[in-house]
A protein has these predicted regions:
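N-terminus-centric sequence/structural signature that marks the extreme N-terminus
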Residues: 1-129
């Protein structure tokens, strides 16, 4: 199981990459295959990845083509091929073969209700520390 971590600064200050890196060090045992982060001003997300699908192209966080949406996902989306084909038919372009990238475009197309279209194994609880 991967390790996902993030920071949102309510004071509006920039997120320090060192803070996300330190959080990643704590979860290194959960994702030995890869690590990545994205920082956008006062918000930062990062992941320690245990690779299952698209071992080379599944680096996370993932973004859409214009980098306006970002995602990290701990799970496996079983119906991602069908969803991807549907989204490509609507004009969405993909950068990787990762099942997680489907989440970005499905969210863009359907909003919060996109989760009802997913068939897979993923964490469905929110945790606040």
């Amino acid at each position: 199981m991967c390790g996902i971590h993030g920071i949102y600064r309510l004071d509006g200050k920039a997120v320090a990459p060192e803070m996300l890196s330190a959080m990643g060090d704590v979860t290194r045992h959960r994702g030995p295959d890869d690590e990545g982060m994205h920082i956008d001003a006062s918000c930062g997300i990062a992941m320690r990845r245990l690779s299952i699908i698209d071992l080379a192209g599944g680096h996370q966080p993932l973004s859409n083509i214009d980098e306006t949406l970002w995602v990290v996902c701990n799970g496996e989306i079983y119906n991602f091929r069908e969803l991807r084909a549907e989204l490509e038919a609507k004009g969405y372009r993909f950068k990787t073969g990762s099942d997680s990238e489907v989440l970005l475009h499905l969210y863009d197309a359907e909003g919060d209700d996109f989760v009802h279209r997913l068939n897979g194994m993923f964490e469905d609880r929110k945790s606040v520390v």
